[in-house]
Amino acid sequence: MRQLKGKPKKETSKDKKERKQAMQEARQQITTVVLPTLAVVVLLIVVFVYVATRPTITE
């Protein structure tokens, strides 16, 4: 049967399995890449704010 333009094709079980695999890999990347990077950025901000606002001792 000819596929008409603009209508999405019906998702096969193979397509569904590939999509689920891609989503699983994306979730795994979130925990292995995004969270440690975010933790480093937050740590840098905290250190910067601490250094910028610490009291200085003048003699």
From Swiss-Prot:
Region feature (Disordered): 1-23
Compositional bias ranges of the Basic and acidic residues kind: 9-22
Residue ranges of coiled coil: 9-31
Chief subcellular location: membrane
GO cellular component, one term: membrane
Assigned keywords, A-Z: Coiled coil, Membrane, Transmembrane, Transmembrane helix
Transmembrane segments: 32-52
Record's subcellular location: Membrane
Entry membrane topology: Single-pass membrane protein
Domain of life: Eukaryota
InterPro entries: DUF4519 (IPR027960)
PANTHER family attached to this UniProt entry: SINGLE-PASS MEMBRANE AND COILED-COIL DOMAIN-CONTAINING PROTEIN 4
Family, per entry: Belongs to the SMCO4 family.
Name of this chain's protein: Single-pass membrane and coiled-coil domain-containing protein 4
Source organism (scientific name): Homo sapiens (Human)
